[in-house]
């Protein structure tokens, strides 16, 4: 009996030990799987200034590691960040920022108004900074950039350690939106060229700090000095830089880890999936969509000697566009049919239809003098989404006319040269709104605008834009822009076709990932759940 009892006890001990060992193994497997969440960023920035090119993806690091006076929240609203309060003067020209009491660099030093001012000085001093001119609305900033005056003449003034005031040349209702761009996030500007070697000495101001830099990516973790550290995820995040859409997607969809010469581990979050795969990924519930700040337009050659210069041709194209149909075929999360020239809200009036009218299109094609111009030349900047859009357009055109359709793709610089030469009838144009100003697109048609791609000429239109720029009354400015819209609508020099949303691919079990309207990912709340 005693032996039986001893045997039974030993069996129980062995079983329990086995369970314990197995549990440890399971925990080990689980730990290795959830030790970090991997986000593939595609591009691999050389520095953390990130102001030499107007690109979006590399700014993901700025929004992750640094923070500015204000920021865009997860609902697309501009909210205080390092500043706790913003006071605007009655004339709308001066903005006073009251800093939070509990803001510190990751190294422990207090963040002061003087540090904010020093950042703006470094930012404006950088001759290679493509964003510097966006601060020309600040009194004295343009002169300082052009070395006409010194920084003491720039109206960025420290009142005390926690108060900084910025005065503008003219009222700009979108000034707060401008400085919400991640490029204005506080950092020691000009000292971040070799950040991968010097990451331990960087003074971070954002929700994360760089924990480690390895061959397989950058590892970031919570900034323990951040004023909202309680709300920031405890997850470690690995940021990788695999720049092939196809390879990234293949790894993202694998249920096991990858070990190759160019990548190890798995990918949980990815942007910029291949266009031809988005619909399938969407149908498999792997795509999340967020409001964007860009619109696709078809712009026409204004030369009346070309097909594009014939208003009947432009009316025909506007009539045949099957925006709703093709947006569904590409991916409804990525593209939504555009019904207005400006960024759309619930209050935006629908000016353009989202459905095609083949009979109306044929009617106006018959009015076009196309005998001398048998080809319809459609040009676009080379990328897969652009190619897909113009191919869909050509299908619609072929249903309404026997004219030959010639599609030509170019690099960005080549496209501009082709437009300057007038070697096109239609050009597909993507316009990125910097700060949701409804007048931003209208201003792009002014003769002095760098964005006036098609060299539109209309003195009446120019005068309206000039008056809108200096109109202090918001309601009057809105009326002026409505007049601009009427001119463009009547002449149909351009047609909005799609609003571009920001889409992200996220594995099941990864929650609370957000993307800003300008396309940057927010990871401070990301969680992996069972």
Where are these regions (language model features)?
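Structural transition elements
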Residues: 332-368, 385-388
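Ligand-site clamp/hinge motif
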Residues: 225-279
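Surface-exposed binding/hinge segments that line
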Residues: 132-189
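Extracytoplasmic/peripheral linker and loop segments enriched in polar/acidic and small residues
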Residues: 403-415, 440-507, 530
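N-terminal lobe/hinge region of extracytoplasmic solute-binding protein
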Residues: 40-90, 121, 203
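Long beta-strand-rich cores associated with HINT superfamily self-processing modules
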Residues: 504-530
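Alpha-helical secondary-structure segments
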Residues: 112-114, 118, 165, 235-236, ...
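Gly/Pro-rich hinge or "lid" segments in bacterial periplasmic/extracellular proteins
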Residues: 167-239, 246
